[in-house]
Amino acid sequence: MSNIIFKKGNIFSSDKQTIVNTINCVGVMGKGVALGFRLRYPEMYEKYKEFCKNKQITIGKLWLYKRPQEDSKWVLNFPTKFHWKYPSKMEYLEAGLQKFVETYQEKGITSIAFPLLGTHNGGLDKIDVLNIMHFYLDKCSIPIEIYEYDPKAPDELYKQFKDKWMSMSIYDKKNLGIRTNQIVVIDKIINDINNSSMASLSECNGIGIITLQKCFNLILNYKEQPMLDWK
């Protein structure tokens, strides 16, 4: 029986010990799942920008980020492209997958959730990527999930945010530094029954990165003292 399970949904809902964040080598996390990681792990994002500035993020080099809290997930940052403007390449995926297979045990990774590498914003074919991921990951002896990105999949963080936001007065919302017109937009999103994830906020016109971070800060504790582990 295969140790790999394919899912379509929200990778942040995974119960696996480690989740994979696909990154470029120039310090940008501006779209899709990467933006979700940026907002959930702002300390990691700041370190990532610093590492990119110092040319420490390269293809085939994996960066394992750990929060000190025992119940926090680890994040494996996996470069799938050099620049965010350019497409991913299969050889980039293979370099990272080979490194993962060689090092996951010594790094203490006991279960992991991958996205379909390089397919959402990287432009690679889903079937080709799934085949190459199976080729390498079938060699591992740990539970593995592979997620196809679905921005509409339910997100527990969204429910927490919605409950918190709806309990706040307009005065409290303004005290967060969110402008009145942005509050109106967020209220509209919150009241739309078709929205069920934080991605619905990030994809809405009129809501910028700074406002998104303020929304995430409502429900996340960012007092991090991260441990960094290079592969």
Which residue stretches match the model-derived regions?
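Macrodomain-like recognition of ADP-ribose-binding/processing modules
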Residues: 1-231
